[in-house]
Amino acid sequence: MIERPKSRERRDVRIPPLGLAGILQIPQNTHALVVFAHGSGSSRFSPRNTAVAEALNDWGIATLLFDLLTPAEEADRANVFNIPLLADRLADAILWLDGQASVAELPLGLFGASTGAAAALVAAAAHPRRVRAVVSRGGRPDLAGGALEQVEAPTLLIVGGADFGVIELNEQAFARLHGTKALEIVPGASHLFPEPGALEAVIDYAARWFERHLAPTAPERARMAG
């Protein structure tokens, strides 16, 4: 039986070099870390990503939600679809986290929504030794392009059963992934999973995926304990 942490530490942080605003939450006895990549038109305050992050905290997984763009960059609509730029921002966040003693040794995963899913996959392909798992919620993994074939991290694609068009794009991207992978379709759910029980299904799929693939190795457990 998993012992749920009773407390968590919340930090409002700034990710260099641009000072992107973020929220880092570290539960008691944390054993893994997940970085979130929000979709177009969203931010670190995404209510759906926040709900997923809080649930992961209950599983003992630390989370970072942060803005992928500066306010000035958000004014240019083209930037929200600039997947290489968004992936670079994830890389900046990973580099910063690796310098934070409280989370530097934790196995790391990425959770991406919409366009953020493509950015997460590109970042995972570029950092195979650091990124250990990826989850996409209502994502556009097809926008990751050639990076799909390079992803080594176990990848879970979650899509709503009523998210017509996006299902097909996920199925096509799924076929291009070569590593450990799974595709879960939530029956009756649309793109933002507002239907009763839909987001809860996303949370359950994501938490179990990260628990399975972000389990610390024996050397990692020793470093975290030491």
Predicted regions and their residues:
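Serine-hydrolase catalytic machinery in alpha/beta-hydrolase-like enzymes
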Residues: 4, 11-106, 192-197, 201-202
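Short beta-strand immediately N-terminal to the catalytic nucleophile in serine-hydrolase-like folds
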Residues: 109-112, 137
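Gly/Ala-rich beta-loop-alpha elbow adjacent to hydrolase catalytic centers
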Residues: 112-120
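Catalytic active-site module of serine/aspartate enzymes centered on a nucleophile-bearing elbow/loop
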Residues: 189-192, 197-226
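A conserved short beta-strand
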Residues: 129-141
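Short beta-strand/loop motif that positions the catalytic acidic residue
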Residues: 151, 157-159
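Conserved alpha/beta-hydrolase "acid-adjacent" motif
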Residues: 164-169
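Catalytic histidine neighborhood in serine/cysteine hydrolases
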Residues: 177-192
